[in-house]
């Protein structure tokens, strides 16, 4: 902020030009679940886990945490047969049914989209697995802006589908801390693929475990890919929705 109008405008123009010149450097590399499975197939024993972020379904960003997109894709690619995967989903009815069945029981559940019922994002799916754990999910967040906050998932259950463990919770909560899985007997450090539903805050604790972090290109309320959002009142052309436009400071 300056008192000289001409100098202030000149500096604003300089910054605008700099941002435009470097606009592509702000873009994050996004991965499909299929790409993650291929990379996991090449992973060597003893390598640190892959942490995959489904930021489109982040409760911290206003999403509901009940998307089954990543689960569906991992199963479709057969990852549950080859890789130790840890996933989470919010689904109170499914958590209750698994808890009622009890540890060791085989259950068939419909999971996903009990809170977000907009069909454009997805639909419930049926799974069959073995109940590994039931209980009340409570953990303390280790680091970042919510350090030492107690998170409560409500009634929860872990259902195993092959080598994949799905943590089904009653309530949405922050899922970007390894303590979420650890409080139900799952260890992220020993997994091949770990799902978090967090855009960035998860790095505070997960970067202590691994540098293999991947942001997914998934549909949802808070996607990493802005093109996945619908804007009805937007001037076109507009970056990044249009990438072939020319822009000048005086335009």
What are these regions (language model features)?
Residues 1-171:
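Hard-cation-handling environments
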Residues 20, 138-251:
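Extended hydrophobic packing segments that form well-structured cores
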